[in-house]
């Protein structure tokens, strides 16, 4: 009897041989990877390996020197960041980028802007349907803050007054506000204590099923990476040196050398 293998999960994003050159420096050199739907894929590597440059290309902040980036069947290689966001890609940054003088709720409402119908004129005139949309957006923001574990009291506080771990939660809620198909997280546990990191790890593992999205993760904490990732891509000096399931990557001699140095 012939056993048919289950069909492969479709890729929400496909990266094909992307290169980014700044002057004479190759920051990313011919990297390819697939991000399946409802999966968690991690990109790891030493500082300066090209991870954030890769993220910036995937979100439209940088244009690749060569190669292709496909979101589903659509080529977004040269698309503007707002177009990429509108197609369902959201991200957080290594350095938190919240508006400190706005409340946590207001910060998350900004993340919903791409899904709102009111334009400039509507926001000025504010007819009844615009006011209704604003109320719905605020309710949605509060729901997301509760979902990421922020208390109702903290939702009303200025973002700049919140503890670091709570600011991270607000940033993730803001990214989720755009209803992404793909969420890019850049060092989400940076600066967190072990308890906060463990809580965020558990939260990330729930996201693909609960929100129907895929996650592409940059993270230096190997406990987090090995605990949540289905596949890992390893970069060193802009080149992909390894790829595969966590156990395979962890035992790869090239990965060990990149992180620990060549052993005599």
Name each model-derived stretch.
Residues 2-264:
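Glycine-rich phosphate-binding loops of nucleotide-dependent enzymes
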